[in-house]
């Protein structure tokens, strides 16, 4: 029997609103920190299917979320495309060779690096209650390309943004390679047991309006189209963080089934500009749940009220902060669970 989250993504509006949180499996949980300390590095944890299964299940056991999102990372795709991937303490991810300097042809694809992720999905699906929806995910091509070009994360994505103007053909080739492998990757996740997938475009907001169509809308549309050609029942949540006024163009142009709002979007405005009946996910500010208190509860109720007339999945506007107290999450869960349309 499909769960509440899956029903909502299929455009059913229920009395109760389903709930999950971006980065719900992670460092704010003491059980995660304990497992991470035993296992060592982040990447080792991701590629250890038994450990990754356990991390994925930890927030489900503790909070009873309606969705379990695969514990992995968006940079698994460039790793499978042949870049060396390291997570350095205090520095974040590093990819080499950086494609600002090297050519894409210098990379040798290693698709078998994805096999451990598929095994994690299989193990999680086998362990989950049937009514808990299993979510897979991948990074969207623009966001993944920003890391591949720069070799690391950056505040302004300057390397990739500059390449979009100075060598758009090279950037297009990188994006096309990401699209190809991402479609394969998402098909593999669905075949292993994922019931819906989310495309994270964390740096969509860094592009000028005339660049947004080419590097955000078109690549995501290609993934959605090809994924649905391969798996017609696939459900896709799009998350164009920072899209702002371009949100409606993204919704219309990509073909995603549902759209996730970041915390800067007024949900009442989103309700007026998005297609009727389209499920919306979001969008409490991660810093508001970090702060907690009555203000968090009131804002949560305001978001629920603003989206009461369409299918709504409650979530944050981005990933939960690692310092968020468990008690604040528990209070959020209680607030959403006790709210009715």
Swiss-Prot record:
The lineage of its organism: Bacteria, Pseudomonadati, Pseudomonadota, Alphaproteobacteria, Sphingomonadales. The record marks 73 as: Transition state stabilizer. InterPro entries: UROD/MetE-like_sf (IPR038071), Uroporphyrinogen_deCO2ase_HemE (IPR006361), Uroporphyrinogen_deCOase (IPR000257). It is found in: Cytoplasm. It catalyses: uroporphyrinogen III + 4 H(+) = coproporphyrinogen III + 4 CO2. Its EC number is 4.1.1.37. The gene is hemE. This is Uroporphyrinogen decarboxylase. Pathway: Porphyrin-containing compound metabolism; protoporphyrin-IX biosynthesis; coproporphyrinogen-III from 5-aminolevulinate: step 4/4.
């Amino acid at each position: 029997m499909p769960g509440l989250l899956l029903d909502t993504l299929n455009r059913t509006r229920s009395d109760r609103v389903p709930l999950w949180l971006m980065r719900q499996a992670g460092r704010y949980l003491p059980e995660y920190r304990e497992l991470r300390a035993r296992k060592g590095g982040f990447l080792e944890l991701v590629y250890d299917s038994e450990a990754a299964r356990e991390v994925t299940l930890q927030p489900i056991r503790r909070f009873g979320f309606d969705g379990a999102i695969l514990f992995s990372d968006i940079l698994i795709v460039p790793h499978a495309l042949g870049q060396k991937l390291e997570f350095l303490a205090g520095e974040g991810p590093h990819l080499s060779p950086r494609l600002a300097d090297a050519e894409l042809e210098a990379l040798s694809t290693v698709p078998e690096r994805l096999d451990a992720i598929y095994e994690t999905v299989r193990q999680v699906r086998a362990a989950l209650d049937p009514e808990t929806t299993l979510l897979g995910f991948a990074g969207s091509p623009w966001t993944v390309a920003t890391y591949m070009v720069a070799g690391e994360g950056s505040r302004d994505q300057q390397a990739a943004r500059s390449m979009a103007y100075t060598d758009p053909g090279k950037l297009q080739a990188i994006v096309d390679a990401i699209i190809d492998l991402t479609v394969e990757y998402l098909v593999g996740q669905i075949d292993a047991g994922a019931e819906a997938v989310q495309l994270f475009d964390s740096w969509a907001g860094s592009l000028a309006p005339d660049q947004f169509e080419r590097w955000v809308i078109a690549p995501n549309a290609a993934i959605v189209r090809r994924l649905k050609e391969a798996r017609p029942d696939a459900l896709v949540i799009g998350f164009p963080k920072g899209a702002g006024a371009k949100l409606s163009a993204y919704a219309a142009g990509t073909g995603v089934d549902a759209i996730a709002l970041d915390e800067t979007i007024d949900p009442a405005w989103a309700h007026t500009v998005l297609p009727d009946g389209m499920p919306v996910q979001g969008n409490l500010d991660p810093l508001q749940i970090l702060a907690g208190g009555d203000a968090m509860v009131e804002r949560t109720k305001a978001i629920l009220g603003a989206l009461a007339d369409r299918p709504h999945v409650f979530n944050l506007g981005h990933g939960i902060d690692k310092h968020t107290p468990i008690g604040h999450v528990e209070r959020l869960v209680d607030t959403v669970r006790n709210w009715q349309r």
